[in-house]
């Protein structure tokens, strides 16, 4: 209920806010990993006092990110057919209300070509492309170094096998931060996202990693 734009062509902002308030009322308790999370989710769903519905328990799903072995990671890599010795990048873009394809489904906007990125990085890297569930499949061209892992059941497995995460405005940032591994924020459409789509909770300067807007900047940040 804190989104101030009308970016979704399927519904008005007031209708979106009603939906979010209705969803918030259905929840008895929210498990919360931090006071910051409680504050922002309370704002998003118009809950009011965060102390009423939020339990400071952490996310149960994140427990695995603190308890794992190198043997487990190796087995997960083998299950995903990741070649030995490759550096593994995980790309987890979020969805945009304003980006719809000809069938009315959400799609990623133009402006970033993962195939170009991988050509620039060279053969030492593998990219795991995890599309947001609102988008579905990643819809990338056949490329032996790009794996569409959108259907992998547990995103935790993808966090664990990766060496670095590339994201944009996705909340996967908060989960991945538990691993204390590097992140790069590829915000090639930052101006339009902030002004016309959903806005930002954090300013770019507060993010825990470099911000890039071109493939070359992203390559430099990864290296």
Q: Predicted regions: what is each one?
A:
Residues 1-67:
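Active-site and donor-binding regions of nucleotide-sugar-utilizing enzymes
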Residues 20, 114, 155:
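Acidic, amphipathic alpha-helical patches
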Residues 28, 87, 163:
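Conserved acidic residues
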Residues 30, 165-166, 183:
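Short, well-ordered beta-strand core segments
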Residues 33-36, 131-133, 169, 214:
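Helix N-cap/beta->alpha junction signal
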Residues 60-141, 212-214:
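Conserved catalytic-core segment of nucleotide-activated headgroup transferases in glycan assembly
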Residues 133-174:
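Donor nucleotide-activated moiety binding/catalytic core segment of transferases
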Residues 142-144, 171-223:
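Catalytic binding pocket for nucleotide-activated donors in carbohydrate/polymer assembly enzymes
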């Amino acid at each position: 209920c804190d989104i101030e734009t009308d970016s979704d062509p399927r519904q008005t902002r007031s209708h979106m806010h009603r939906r979010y308030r209705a969803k918030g009322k259905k929840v008895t308790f929210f498990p919360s990993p931090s006071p910051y999370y409680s504050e922002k989710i309370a704002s998003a769903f118009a809950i009011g006092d965060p102390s009423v519905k939020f339990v400071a328990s952490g996310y149960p799903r994140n427990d695995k990110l603190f308890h794992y072995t190198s043997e487990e990671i190796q087995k997960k890599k083998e299950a995903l057919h990741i070649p030995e010795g490759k550096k593994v990048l995980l790309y987890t873009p979020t969805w945009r209300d304003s980006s719809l394809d000809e069938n009315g489904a959400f799609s990623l906007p133009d402006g970033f070509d993962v195939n170009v990125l991988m050509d620039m990085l060279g053969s030492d890297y593998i990219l795991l492309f995890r599309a947001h569930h609102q988008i579905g499949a990643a819809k990338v061209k056949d490329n032996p170094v790009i794996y569409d892992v959108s259907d992998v059941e547990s995103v935790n497995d993808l966090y664990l096998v990766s060496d670095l995460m590339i994201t944009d405005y996705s909340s996967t940032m908060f989960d991945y931060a538990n691993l204390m591994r590097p992140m790069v924020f590829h915000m090639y459409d930052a101006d339009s996202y902030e002004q016309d789509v959903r806005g930002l909770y954090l300013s770019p300067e507060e993010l825990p990693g470099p911000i890039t807007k071109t493939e070359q900047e992203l390559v430099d940040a990864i290296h």
